[in-house]
Amino acid sequence: MAKELKELTPRSESYSQWYQDLVIKADLAENSAVRGCMVIKPYGYAIWEKMQRQLDDMFKETGHVNAYFPLFIPKSFLSREAEHVEGFAKECAVVTHYRLKANPDGDGVVVDPQAKLEEELIVRPTSETIIWNTYKNWIQSHRDLPILCNQWANVVRWEMRTRLFLRTAEFLWQEGHTAHATKEEAEEEARRMLEVYATFAEEYMAMPVVKGVKSANERFAGAVDTYTIEALMQDGKALQSGTSHFLGQNFAKAFNVTFADKDGNRDFVWATSWGVSTRLMGALIMSHSDDNGLVLPPKLAPYQVVIIPIYRNEEQLAQIDEKATQITQALRAKGISVKYDNSDNKKPGWKFAEYELKGIPVRLAMGARDLENNTIEIARRDTLTKETVGLDGIEETVATLLDDIQKNIFQKALNYRKEHTITVDSYEEFKEKIEDGGFILAHWDGTSETEERIKAETKATIRCIPLNGDMTPGKCMVTGKPSPQRVLFARAY
């Protein structure tokens, strides 16, 4: 049964199917009755809650507060920012009526034709328009600035080709929307939030990222600049994991949001927006997991430790229960989250397989011999190694091990990225190497035409213009025209 529980398609056989198998079998999420929408199951949601809690703390540490804005946006609002509406028009879900009625045929319900809305409503794909319409009422003077708001919400972008967590019609996210008196302050905010995302990705998700700026083609609709963090998955594809946008005065002008400065002169407000979504769940799964199941960084695991008793009779179980309770209390006193699984409906072998599949970082197993010797077996999920250790100071042993696992998972992902990042100078070499996956650093002439040609011919996109990259100028690999620095290419999710 334990083998059946864990039967995942190997990554080498089909990475896509492995991912799908893992999300389902590890009880993270499943498809719903609504096409393109997912059910996030309790175990998956527990991971998302840990992400949410940590990010929320980081937002508040940088001066942000939470608010909530409507799910529905009047269609006319989207029309006010031309680039913005063009970017989202094909993905919008539209509400046209406000009532149902009983079917005259007696079969279920139908839309009441008398209940047509005067103005159609858009189910939010993102909230810039509704928020800036609101900010107009909040901002009169420089004393009202800055506004530093974040919203935790769901959004809808009608996707035809969906994958659990990575691309769904409805997803959960946070979106920050800030208003500032100066361009410099807004630009600083956009960069600050990029740093917050990068810190979260690397220190909590144990996922190395490249920080950069998007090209004009890849920029958020309505933004002046889009900053991004890009991660490399185990199949050699990039995953955009968070974005922060400097919006200039575009939305302030669209909604006529002005303020009086210290001299009484009126000017348009400067803006940013920034967000991450449940897509991070997909990034977390694909960054670290293996053919045995999830590998979770301890900082985001719902439980960091699971304790499993191994016993022959009720007397042994009672003795192990007593000792396990002491261990659990000692670990929790150190801030370590623990689950003691003494359920009698599954054998230890099944439990080992289940918690390995679910990526619990540390497994402790205790049997009768351990009771006699004052020892316990300790197994780590990241390396699948185990050893028997003394119980004295077990909380220190586990705390040190969790810290080591967090660092090891990050280092492993970093090593993978280093091994799969190359530099090329010729377009012929680029076309050959892109088939192997990974990041490619190459010179580009800065034009949309060249970027579109590369995408059409190779399916690779410019993931970002790295902020801390190789600033040596050169010649575009396609046209030979001057290039100020290398940019990061990859095929992407």
Swiss-Prot record:
It is found in: Cytoplasm. GO terms for biological process: prolyl-tRNA aminoacylation. InterPro entries: aa-tRNA-synt_IIb (IPR002314), aa-tRNA-synth_II (IPR006195), aa-tRNA-synth_II/BPL/LPL (IPR045864), Anticodon-bd (IPR004154), Anticodon-bd_dom_sf (IPR036621), Pro-tRNA-ligase_IIa_arc-type (IPR004499), Pro-tRNA_ligase_II_C (IPR016061), Pro-tRNA_synth_II (IPR017449). Its EC number is 6.1.1.15. Keywords: Aminoacyl-tRNA synthetase, ATP-binding, Cytoplasm, Ligase, Nucleotide-binding, Protein biosynthesis. The keyword Aminoacyl-tRNA synthetase applies. It catalyses: tRNA(Pro) + L-proline + ATP = L-prolyl-tRNA(Pro) + AMP + diphosphate. One of its GO terms (molecular function) is ATP binding. Its main location: cytoplasm. GO terms for cellular component: aminoacyl-tRNA synthetase multienzyme complex; cytoplasm. Consists of three domains: the N-terminal catalytic domain, the anticodon-binding domain and the C-terminal extension. Belongs to the class-II aminoacyl-tRNA synthetase family. ProS type 3 subfamily. Homodimer. HAMAP family: Pro_tRNA_synth_type3. This is Proline--tRNA ligase. The lineage of its organism: Bacteria, Pseudomonadati, Bacteroidota, Bacteroidia, Bacteroidales. The gene is proS.
